[in-house]
């Protein structure tokens, strides 16, 4: 009889400084934060150890001592299919799965494959800042559709978007669940987005990297492909284990494209750029997408929900500050506009006063001004410390 799996210790304080860690070691370069007690709450990875089966899979490869070119990893593909069906109710054909070097790379490939220089790409803003960066770097333009707010959460604004398209749009990139707002889009909303894309002949790229990070008590995430199967001929779904299981360093994700013609165009760009999985990532993902991994994720989202409660309560004590209700992700989106403090003043207080690195809202596009995004996927003691520092940094508003 095998021993019961060890419960993850999300309260463990792991020292990541000095480990070539972007999140902790680059605060000085990006924010000018060099104090030894500075808190990294910007880059979207977690300060938790990966699940034990993932670490064991990696250790097994390392122990072999041979790190040559990998072949096709069927266990990896089977694990993706098992996970999508058991966790999301989506039966995926093996041939529909293409492996990319992370989802920013996957997004860039889609922009390259399905649009041309000078074309426009639709983004519902504020939204993950890498989307606009990738689009502009490829010589394409961004058409923004600013999200509305209803009952303190982001919502689609079809009436407000009337007439905003120029006719040059060829693609819409959707973030589902939404980053930075933490919103889980409903099946009805996804169908509306799909109908919008079909009516305007747009390719729909659905980035669903946060789909395993839906917090307890929130609406269930619906895969866009299931909500709107009629759009399969123009849909690219991007998924990855890297966000939910803290494997971002593996640089591995999936472009799931059921339509053969659409998939061939995407695969052609991959082939031209020599993109294929490395040796270490696929076995790590195969170990994560397992019953043990499912139990780990369930424990994780419960922990994150309590972190969100602690953080939100702390932000609510700052006059004029408000955190958006988090349904998914571990990224708290805080609106400081009620304080009357501009972006420069916010940075002075948060970075200079509280010694916290958080993402600047302006980088997320229209609607991001006077906002900051805080990563709360860290031990609760750090969340509590961050709250105390923020309250002190804004104490004069009391």
Regions found by a protein language model. Name each.
Residues 67-195, 212-213, 217-230, 236:
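Conserved core of the PLP fold type I
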Residues 56, 228-305, 312-313, 394:
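Conserved core segment of the aminotransferase class I/II
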Residues 138, 199-200, 354, 397:
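Helix C-cap/helix->beta junction micro-motif
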Residues 4-102, 109, 291, 397-398:
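N-terminal small-domain helix-loop-helix segment of the aminotransferase-like
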Residues 162, 340, 349-358, 363-398:
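PLP-dependent enzyme catalytic core of the Aspartate aminotransferase-like
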């Amino acid at each position: 009889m095998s021993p019961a799996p060890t419960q993850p210790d999300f309260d463990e304080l792991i020292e990541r400084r000095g480990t070539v860690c972007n999140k902790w070691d680059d605060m000085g370069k990006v924010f000018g934060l060099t104090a030894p007690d500075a808190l990294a709450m910007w880059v979207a990875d977690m300060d938790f150890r990966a699940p034990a089966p993932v670490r064991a899979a990696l250790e097994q490869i390392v122990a072999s001592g041979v790190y040559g070119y990998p072949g096709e990893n069927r266990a990896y593909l089977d694990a993706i299919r098992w996970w999508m069906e058991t966790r999301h109710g989506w039966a995926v054909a093996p041939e529909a799965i293409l492996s990319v070097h992370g989802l920013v790379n996957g997004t860039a490939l889609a922009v390259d494959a399905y649009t041309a220089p000078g074309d426009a790409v639709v983004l519902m803003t504020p939204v993950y800042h890498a989307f606009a960066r990738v689009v502009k770097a490829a010589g394409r333009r961004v058409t923004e559709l600013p999200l509305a707010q209803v009952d303190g959460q982001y919502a689609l604004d079809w009436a407000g978007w009337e007439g905003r398209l120029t006719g040059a749009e060829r693609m819409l990139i959707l973030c589902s669940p939404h980053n930075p707002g933490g919103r889980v889009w409903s099946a009805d909303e996804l169908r509306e987005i799909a109908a919008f894309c079909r009516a305007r002949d747009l390719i729909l790229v659905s980035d669903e990297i946060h789909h395993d990070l839906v917090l307890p008590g929130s609406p269930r995430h619906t895969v866009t492909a299931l909500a709107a199967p009629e759009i399969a001929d123009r849909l690219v779904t991007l998924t990855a284990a890297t966000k939910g299981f803290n494997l971002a360093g593996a640089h591995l994700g999936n472009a799931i494209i059921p339509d053969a013609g659409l998939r061939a165009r995407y695969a052609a760009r991959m082939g031209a750029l020599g993109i294929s999985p490395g040796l270490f990532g696929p076995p790590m993902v195969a170990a994560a997408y397992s019953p043990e991994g499912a139990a780990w994720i369930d424990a994780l989202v419960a922990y994150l929900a309590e972190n969100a409660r602690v953080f939100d309560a702390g932000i609510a004590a700052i006059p004029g500050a408000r955190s958006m209700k988090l349904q998914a992700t571990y990224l708290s989106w805080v609106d400081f506009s009620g304080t009357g403090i501009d972006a420069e003043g916010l940075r002075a207080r948060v970075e200079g006063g509280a010694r916290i690195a958080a993402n600047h809202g302006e980088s997320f596009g229209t609607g991001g001004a006077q906002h900051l995004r805080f990563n709360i996927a860290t031990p609760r003691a750090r969340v509590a410390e961050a709250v105390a520092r923020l309250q002190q940094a804004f104490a004069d508003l009391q």
